[in-house]
């Protein structure tokens, strides 16, 4: 089973769009889109990972 991952190399970004494409983080929090998720990954110093695509 392959791990689900997202390329966050272009982040952090100062502003994210309102586009809703949810991702579920390893903290069991639903992030609205890749931008919001990747900004949180950067803030967590890489400890936050992706559980799955879609809501938690």
Swiss-Prot record:
Where is the site described as Reactive bond 3 found in this chain? 18-19
GO molecular function (one)? serine-type endopeptidase inhibitor activity
Can you give the residue ranges of the Kazal-like domain?
6-56
Coiled-coil spans are none
> Per its UniProt record, what CDD domains does this chain match?
KAZAL_FS
Any S-S bridges, and between which cysteines?
A: 8-38, 16-35, 24-56
Localization terms from the record: Secreted
Domain of life assignment: Eukaryota
Q: Primary place of residence?
A: secreted
Glycans attached where? 45
Q: Which SMART domains would you find in this protein's record?
A: KAZAL
The record ties this protein, via Gene3D superfamilies, to: 3.30.60.30
Q: Which UniProt keywords apply?
A: Disulfide bond, Glycoprotein, Protease inhibitor, Repeat, Secreted, Serine protease inhibitor
Supply the PROSITE patterns for this chain.
Answer: KAZAL_1, KAZAL_2
> Can you list the GO cellular component terms from the UniProt entry?
extracellular space
What the entry lists under InterPro entries is as follows: Bifunctional_prot_inhibitor (IPR051597), Kazal_dom (IPR002350), Kazal_dom_sf (IPR036058), Prot_inh_Kazal-m (IPR001239)
Give any Pfam family that matches.
Kazal_1
Per the record, the domain comment is:
Avian ovomucoid consists of three homologous, tandem Kazal family inhibitory domains.
The protein, known as: Ovomucoid
């Amino acid at each position: 089973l392959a791990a689900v991952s997202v390329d966050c190399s272009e982040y952090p970004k100062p502003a994210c769009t309102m586009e809703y494409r949810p991702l579920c983080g390893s903290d069991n929090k639903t992030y609205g889109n890749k931008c919001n998720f990747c900004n949180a990954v950067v803030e967590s110093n890489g400890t936050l990972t992706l559980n799955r695509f879609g809501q938690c």
